[in-house]
Amino acid sequence: MKRTRTAIIAAAAAALLGLTSCSAGATETSETSDSGLPAAEAGSALDLSDVCPATVVLQQDWEPEAEHGAMYALVGSDYTIDEEGNTVTGSLVAQGVDTGVDVQVRPGGPTYSYQSVSTLMYLDDSITLGAVNTDQAISSYADQPTIAVTSQLTYSPQILMWDPDTYPDATTIADVIAEGATVLTSGDIVPALLEETVGLDPAKSDTSYDSTSARFVADPSLLQQGFATAEPYIYENEIAEWDKPVDYQLLSDIGYNIYPEPLAVRADKLEELTPCLEKLVPIMQQSQIDYLNDPTETNELIVELAEAYDTGWVYSEGVADYSAQTQVSDGLAVDDPASGVFGQFDPDRMQEIVDTFVPLLEAQGTLPEGTEIDPEDLYTNEFIDTSISID
């Protein structure tokens, strides 16, 4: 589902939430690199110079934000910002050492005319990894197949939110729908899912959400889409016309069980990139944990990039800090429950995702009727370091 967000204005930073991580420490290092950090020991797990592209290109699906913290956390302090191309490039730094290659992080959204990440990956052969939602991977399976190699968030931060003053007895989406609320979204997938899971009347679906707050402020009877990592903070702290809490429930609780923005490769490049992925995937697993443990510097970079790109996307330090906290407190970034490994995919869950979303996408005409997808074609756990845990 295409992501949209309410415009954000400046706010005070929130307190950071500590998080302990479990993983191997940095490998013994040798010389100092251009980034000012020790260079990874040659041939070690953190030395990417002999196996990865000279510049590892990471493609996101939206503007700079804290949900993408693991990518931006890899960017060394020697970074440069291309304000015309909207990219940031620097030494790829992991666990305190320079890995011997550069990293370039590219945003999605208006910079690339809102094209999907899978489309961008097939247009630009230089992209190493892209953030491809599982439902998007299903949609593009026939023409632009991608294979996810690790997750970053375990559960989607997408929500439906409501006014607790209007619905004082409601604790779930189903409760609000039962009281006759109209569901305001920007697409058809969520309403179709709600029809199946909580009995939403199709007549109560409004897909004209435009990412602004005006409708919700004017009509607090609405049940509106948003992100747990943004809208609750924004509405309470940055929208003067509202200026109070909202209640919400995660869509993952009611069947929207995709992996959000897992890192994927083009299917036809998996073999070529295997030597790189054997080292890069564990680095990405640990990068998310390290970011959530201490998001301060990365959040500063994210806010700087949002300002520099000047696309109309405004992102405050307050939202960034709230997002990092919420990724932990709402259980969005957790170990895979089936294996206890952070970043690993659950085969049974992948089967459930295919079983849920193929019929929905067929009904919308996104997929032809009779589409058959083997879930194992959508992901691999081959490169996962099973010793890495967020607990």
Tell me the role of every PLM-derived stretch.
Residues 31-209:
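Short, glycine-/small- and polar/acidic-enriched structural segments
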Residues 135-136, 210-214, 219-310:
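Pocket-lining segment of extracytoplasmic ligand-binding domains
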Residues 154-160, 164, 259-263, 268, ...:
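Small-molecule pocket liners
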Residues 347-391:
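Conserved C-terminal helix/tail region of periplasmic/extracytoplasmic solute-binding proteins
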Residues 19-37:
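Bacterial lipoprotein signal-peptidase II cleavage site
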